[in-house]
Amino acid sequence: MKAEATVIPSRCARGQTTAAPGVQPWQTSVPQNTTQPKLLAPRQHEKSQKRSSLLKELGAFHITIALLHLVFGGYLASTVKSLHLVVLKSWYPFWGAASFLISGILAITMKTFSKTYLKMLCLMTNLVSLFCVLSGLFVISKDLFLESPFESPIWRMYPNSTVHIQRLELALLCFTVLELFLPVPTAVTAWRDRPSAKNDDACLLPNTPSHLKGLPVEPPPSYQSVIQGDAQHKQHQRLREVKQVTPDTWIVTDGAGIWTQTAN
């Protein structure tokens, strides 16, 4: 007895169907009620990073000016003995430097940790720093222009110790003017910055599909389980179905095609 087999290719043998992205290989369409992921725009994320970097730089400027106030104020306090300087009587170089130093540290800390209470503290300290700057401008201007205790002009050929003190106070005035332009930009940048790093990370995560909400979160399948599932699926496709049409003819159907087998 000889057997002749004729292969009739089916649709599965002629070509493979391409599944839609996000579905299983045996699915032909995307499940209903599936929400497409919404990611944060790259430009918006870059703006957030630039804003955080700017906040760190502003904090560094605060700290630098605070240290300069301490250096010049300490030198003036140690050298001036006979002159009556309002800037020293009010102790402006020290409480002004403390205000600027706290503002800078909070700005850098907020950029590092990004908490809501740090944001509020940063806004409050910058507001206090602004009042300290205005007060410092008033007391220094009173020493240099309104009630000047200096007899000789500030620019002379052979300066004495009094002229050096006058120049130091003028330098302190310049640093105070620079500090005047820092509290407002720092406060605005801190206000626009995100209150928490968790919110920034949450914007980068896709939305959960509505039909998956409430289900327990499970880890993704391993590589071996995926390979085993694919092999089982292929084995399931290759299961043959034998159907006898006539006493000498059988039709065999499997995943590769339809076989017609006859016996002579």
Swiss-Prot record:
Keywords: Membrane, Receptor, Transmembrane, Transmembrane helix. Residues 1-57, 111-119, 191-264 are cytoplasmic. The gene is MS4A10. May be involved in signal transduction as a component of a multimeric receptor complex. It comes from Pongo abelii. This is Membrane-spanning 4-domains subfamily A member 10. It is a multi-pass membrane protein. The chain crosses the membrane at residues 58-78, 90-110, 120-140, 170-190. Residues 17-37 have a biased composition (Polar residues). It is found in: Membrane.
